[in-house]
Amino acid sequence: AAMAETRPAVRAARWHNYNAIKDTIADAQCDPVQAVADIIAFAIWNAQRVNDPYKLCRIHESGDFFSLTYFLAWIQVAREHPEIKFYAYTKQLEYWLGVHKSGCIPDNFYLTASMGGDEDYLLDQHPEVFKRVAVVVYTEEAATQHGFEIDHDDSHCFGDKPFALLVHNNQRKGSDAAKALAARRRQGSWTGYNK
């Protein structure tokens, strides 16, 4: 959200994509999952025409899966592109659990549970499913106290244990998160992820 505020073109592109996908879901005559998967796959193909082929694709820089259809479409895209590792952070644990139970998550699709959502109760109920859990902390000391390694480069998204992320990017003015980030900036410490 913070990037969208500082970069209007990014915000406009994200809303365009969101609306295109929602319209496709609403207008799909047969299979909305495949219709959305086709849009996503076309966007990947189009981006690769002018860039190097993707080996890694992070789903959402910010945001989450807004519907089960959208979630399933990404799984379909991963199935169709086994040469690409897809990964995402999500609080949509019920979607993940349902698809996991059906055995339909491909090997190149990595999900990390983002702690702090309404479905966190599922984390303790299904630790065999939710092995990768990300917890946002304000300081390196807090991560150490909880026994978490800090992920600075998304590499922990491919492991099998919980990890911490330091609070980053822009935070609401006056919030504890903003104060923690400002303190790290004053110390010359790490304050953000490279995209």
Locations of regions flagged by a protein language model:
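Class I S-adenosyl-L-methionine
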Residues: 1-195
